């Protein structure tokens, strides 16, 4: 090839230029031809369009290729009437096995299995139908108002020391703020202080932190009576009664899962079912606002208020003031059309994980025996309590909330299902009544003999890093990070025959020794009296409660505390509108 001959690449480039030039010339010629033609009149344009339409109409489509016009298809209707759905939801707990089979036959579903299986099968279908009916009745209603009429914001204050690791907190302030969901405003407030038993003398740090004086808790009622006063206040608004729709709102999971559960263990009562599911507003806030600011020296409540352009009202670490600010956050989020729903619960069994997280769980299996000394102090504390407390913290998905699957309670099924077996049911009721009566007599006897007693303080731990403000420690992510590491503890209630020796106290040493109790910690616990030695709340002053109720009706406490707190629990498979009454 000589130097004057073009290369193959040059030939291709020249050919492309010739093609572009040809296209450009043809385009210019077409424009020039259109400019030379005279403009058509409106009649000519209309006639041209008519010819085009006629030519299109003249096209014959083969019959086998023609599509018939579709007819309007009515949407599928429910197999059962709405009234029957409502009836099943209301009576699900008390329906016999034959009635459950009839309900399943109406929807053409298998009727095999025992009563427990039948009830769950009925609940699975009729809950979905009930949720759809509620949405049809109020399609434009506020999201939260579809599920609740009232919300109760709570924030407990507890005994504490400067070092919070592995410390047995006791509730010393029990506040509640009632929110009308439809009106989106606070309508009532309640507060009572509580006398601690395991650590009756408050530490200097606790008094400075909570601004609660020693004299205040000394004159306060014990937890059982304080809880009864909360119930009495709630009854004024028909909360806890049949068909009442309400939920508790907390700033984090610890108020219900840790503080309330451990306080019930100390008081030797079963944790009431209405406290076992709640709205963790911090969790909802993080999901809707892409997280929460940390490390700025402010509590989670303050950061949420600041993000919503609100200001903190009252004193920090005051239970009632914190609950009032939580209520303000909830109201503002409802005004922004953010759905507030049950998103966490306490249960004996962990909720089933989705298949997408199974690989992650396998990776965390090796971390189950993690060395707690190498973990941050707040996470160590969280892990220890997750192992010790019988009710585990778990999340509630939106599907589980809408279908009300989160209300399923395996711990009460046996008691409820025995109602058809009259002999077995009467035996259990007799044992329960005996336990209640014996417990009441023991409390009264010890109170008459010993009166008020003092318990030594638990020693401080000098090896841990001090925590100045526990509200600043955000361990909300602990559930997600460490939830799969904790060993499940199956709790089985064993009720001995009436004639045998009965013990009503909780073995706190066994609870304390569960995965992590050191010898020094157990020595401190051994100095505390058993639950039989708790003085009766009747010895406390009736003026110890500071209550703030906007309603004018006075508060009378004349109900039997044991009957209220230890009543046979209902199976909670029914609608959330039928919350367990007290």
Curated annotation (Swiss-Prot):
Function summary: RNA exonuclease that acts as a negative regulator of RNA interference (RNAi). Probably acts by degrading the 3'-overhangs of short interfering RNAs (siRNAs). Component of the ERI/DICER complex which is involved in processing amplified double-stranded RNA (dsRNA) intermediates during small-RNA-mediated gene-silencing or RNA interference (RNAi).
Compartment(s) of residence: Cytoplasm
Positions of region (Disordered): 27-61, 515-582
Biased composition (Low complexity): 529-548, 572-582
A Pfam family of this chain: RNase_T
Protein name (Swiss-Prot/TrEMBL): 3'-5' exonuclease eri-1
UniProt source species: Caenorhabditis elegans
Documented EC number(s): 3.1.-.-
CDD domains, sorted: ERI-1_3'hExo_like
